[in-house]
C-alpha cells in the first residue's frame, strides 16, 4: 500500500487559512495519510481534525513542524519527496516514477518556498508550468498517481456518510457505539 503525506510550507495564518485547509481536505480525500504543517496554526489543526471526526478516516495533522527535519527523516526511512510548483519537470514525465513510490511526501508551498526545497526534493514537478492553486496541484498529482479509486474510498468511523444521488443531498448519520 502506498503511503502519502503532504508537507505544507509557507502557510501564513492570517492569509492562507482557507487554502491550507482545502489543501489538507483534498489530500485527505485523495488518499494521503496526513499533513505536516510547517507553521503554527491551531485553527487549521482543529478544522481538519473536526472533518476527520465527522467524516471518518485516519488522517492526521502535525502542526509547526521543521520542514528540513521532516524531509530528512522521511528520506532516511526510504521515502521520496515530490515538490509541486509551476517550475520543474512536467508532471506527465514523472507520473510513472511517482506511481512506483511506496512512500511519498508531496510538498506544496504558499509563499515563495525556501531555495533548499529544490535540492531536498527527489523531484521538482511542474503542474502545468503556469500559475495555479496549490489545491489544484495536489488534486491533479494525487489523482494521476492514485492506486485504486480514491473517489470511491470509504472512510471508516464516519459520523456522516453521503449517499450518491442524481439530485438533492442525501446524508446518513451513522450510529457510533
Swiss-Prot record:
Binding positions (S-adenosyl-L-methionine): 84, 109-113
InterPro entries tied to this protein: Alpha/beta_knot_MTases, tRNA_m1G_MTases_N, tRNA_mtfrase_aTrm56
Record-listed E.C. numbers: 2.1.1.206
Pfam families per UniProt: Trm56
Catalytic reaction equation(s): cytidine(56) in tRNA + S-adenosyl-L-methionine = 2'-O-methylcytidine(56) in tRNA + S-adenosyl-L-homocysteine + H(+)
CDD domains in the cross-refs: aTrm56-like
Keyword flag Secreted: no
Any one GO MF annotation of this record: tRNA (cytidine(56)-2'-O)-methyltransferase activity
Cysteine disulfide links: none
Primary location: cytoplasm
GO-annotated cellular components: cytoplasm
Major enzyme class: transferase
Keyword Transferase applies: yes
Keywords: Cytoplasm, Methyltransferase, S-adenosyl-L-methionine, Transferase, tRNA processing
Source taxon at top rank: Archaea
Entry similarity comment: Belongs to the aTrm56 family.
HAMAP family assigned: tRNA_methyltr_aTrm56 (MF_00077)
Functional description taken from the UniProt entry: Specifically catalyzes the AdoMet-dependent 2'-O-ribose methylation of cytidine at position 56 in tRNAs.
Name used for this protein in its record: tRNA (cytidine(56)-2'-O)-methyltransferase
Natural source organism: Methanosarcina acetivorans (strain ATCC 35395 / DSM 2834 / JCM 12185 / C2A)
Amino acid at each position: 500500500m502506498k503511503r502519502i503525506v503532504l508537507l505544507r510550507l509557507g502557510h501564513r495564518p492570517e492569509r492562507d487559512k482557507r487554502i491550507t485547509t482545502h489543501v489538507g481536505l483534498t489530500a485527505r480525500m485523495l488518499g494521503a495519510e496526513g499533513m505536516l504543517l510547517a507553521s503554527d496554526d491551531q485553527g487549521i489543526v482543529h478544522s481538519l481534525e473536526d472533518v476527520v471526526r465527522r467524516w471518518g478516516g485516519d488522517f492526521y495533522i502535525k502542526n509547526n513542524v521543521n520542514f528540513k527535519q521532516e524531509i530528512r527523516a522521511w528520506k532516511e526511512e526510504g521515502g521520496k519527496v515530490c515538490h509541486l510548483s509551476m517550475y520543474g519537470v512536467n508532471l506527465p514525465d514523472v507520473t510513472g516514477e511517482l506511481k512506483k513510490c511506496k512512500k511519498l511526501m508531496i510538498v506544496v508551498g504558499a509563499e515563495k518556498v525556501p531555495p533548499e526545497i529544490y535540492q531536498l526534493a527527489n523531484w521538482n514537478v511542474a503542474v502545468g508550468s503556469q500559475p495555479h492553486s496549490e489545491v489544484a496541484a495536489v488534486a491533479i498529482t494525487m489523482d494521476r498517481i492514485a492506486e485504486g479509486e480514491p473517489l470511491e474510498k470509504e472512510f471508516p468511523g464516519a459520523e456522516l456518510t453521503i449517499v450518491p444521488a442524481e439530485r438533492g443531498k442525501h446524508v446518513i448519520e451513522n450510529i457510533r457505539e
